[in-house]
Amino acid sequence: CLVGSEMCIRDRAEGVEHPDLEALFTVDEETGLTGAFNLGSDMLSGRYLINLDSEDDGEIFIGCAGGVDTVATFRYREEPAPEGMTWMQADLSGLKGGHSGDNINDGLGNSNKLLTRLLLAGTERMGLRLASFDGGNLRNAIPREAHAVFGVPAGQADEMRRLTGQFAATFAEEYKYTDAGVRLEVREAGKPATVIDAGTQRSLLLALQGVANGVLAMSRSMPGLVETSTNLASVKFADGGRIVVTSSQRSSVESAKADAAATVGAAFRLAGAEVEHGEGYPGWNPDPSSRLLQIAEAAYEHLFGTQPKVRAIHAGLECGLFLEKYPKLEMISVGPTLRGVHSPDERLEIATVDKFWKFLIEILRTL
């Protein structure tokens, strides 16, 4: 869309009044924001930036969330799996999952948090010993599944099964409106060679239970928009006696993003983990009073007789990085309607392209 729009402006806009134009092209937006990260602070001179990366006709985006990863590493001692235990595997499945930005306000279950509730209860009530925990995968996804292998004293195996059934019923009730398919099951497993030491196990489970997850704050400027959130993305056993817990924090307010990451990191540090924060990327705090937004709203209503929806997204856009390099920019993000984005089914709704072209030209003419 960006390339096509720039060509149209150059080739077809004869007679259309508009200010001097600069065209900014970036690379690697989907996988690493490489182009935006490397944008020079002296490359642009304009006051307004119209980002052509939105995916719905009739919507104008004026904000996005920045993000940062927080990774906690627990180091444990391997101990021989004790005798006299019944070994089991617990499987938490059936959750919907979703994007940790777009869907964080949907009240979806987090498999890592739910399975931790069972494991911590088993530890405190019957001396459960943990051999492995594997939950979630992608850092930007709400985890759908989690699995753990553990042992309980043989005489308490039936009690562990009853406890699992109780938690299964609890989760089904708690998430009947959002994750109706949630399942928690336990089955027999082979005896593992080792378990993690009891002290690290307790610290890990208490940290997973206690760490924040979900929406932390709503926007003060845009009703219904999540401002700040955190997602407990994955728990993985790694080589060298390590357990790696990955989480991600998002916010359209840079200071709030930093505070969320610090809060999550503090919880893990208190539990004895080593914590590292990723480089991250900045957000774009919505400005509903922007002159560029007012021009765009008026242009859309003038052309099509209806008001556009003004939105912000709790996910990353390049605009946050643009604003970091050029803090005085006024920005909006618009585009024609796309469906199935980032999949083999990606497609463009052709009927919206002409509307998008007319809308863009009207904005430029009015500036």
Protein language model features and the residues they cover:
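Zn-dependent metallopeptidase/amidohydrolase metal-coordination segment
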Residues: R220, E227-I243, S248, E297-A298, ...
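Active-site-adjacent substrate-binding region
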Residues: N103, N110-N112, R117-F133, G278, ...
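Hard-cation-handling environments
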Residues: L163-G241
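Single conserved hydrophobic/aromatic residue that forms the stacking wall/gate
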Residues: C1-G4, I9
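A short beta-alpha structural unit
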Residues: H147-V149, R183-V195, A233, V244-E254, ...
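His/Asp/Glu-rich mid-to-C-terminal helical/loop segments that flank catalytic regions of hydrolases
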Residues: S41-D42, L108-R125, V152-A157, R202-Q209, ...
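Fold-level recognition of mixed alpha/beta catalytic cores in primary-metabolism enzymes, strongest
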Residues: V16-S111, L119-T123
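Short amphipathic alpha-helices in soluble, non-transmembrane regions
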Residues: D158-A172, D259-F268
